[in-house]
Amino acid sequence: LVAAFPKRPMDLHKYSAGTVTIVGGSSHFIHAPVIAGLGARAAGAGLVQLVVPDASRLATGMLLPEATFTKQTPACVPPRADVTAIGMGLGTSQNSELLLSRLLSGSTGRFVLDADALSLLANWYARKTGALPISEGQSLILTPHAGEAARLLACTPDDIQRDRLGAVRRIVARYRSVVVLKGPHTLVAAPGRDDVFSCEAGNPFMAVGGMGDLLSGILAARWAYLAKNADGDPFTAAASAVWLHATASDALVNANPPGDPSIANTAHAVASLRVALERS
């Protein structure tokens, strides 16, 4: 996986480093997309663009001043990007469904779907007997935890945990997407591949709210960078992002003395590890 972090060329600029747009947030979940933005910046995105409600604007300015801001509405047009991450704190209201449906059905590109976007995707599948609002030419990465995976497969979280390998393969087959099944030894699987990546790094201190949002931003940034500077393979992007996130957290909690495994500190640890890899 170290090969997924090539040395940065001297003539790199913010657009060739990869651009990421993050669509999320609601009045109840103000900070989720901002956390994803922190992950994207830590993982090396050259430009982070947030499409969030007004309620998230202050948090964006305070926590991620380098990001651009677009007000989120059902009819908004998110800035174009190499990768768009959708769902963190978005909610499952009718307006959220309209926005997600319009983004997925009206454009081609690379999309990371997390959190509420996964619930909406599962609802569409159940309602329309497999018809999904996905256009030809799109490439998707889904990032469910066990509960979200259960919704995607219409089963229970216990069913997922009893057979995580089988579950990740079933989600891949049903939704024709790369899938990151989060949890102990996070799994990454992709259409057309028999192998499944299992991440051996990680620790129980990662079990805090917002850690999944951070990973979604990290994943979007790595995919955007590889799309600009390598072959852009989504499986490689997903596996390398999962590894980077977990390994950085391990370095933090295993330090002497141990570091505080907060979201902000984990983002800093991700940035430090990523820079060390990309300058070697």
Residue ranges and their predicted role:
Residues 1-115, 119-141, 146-280:
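Small-residue (G/A/S/T)-rich helix-start motifs and N-terminal tracts that mark the onset
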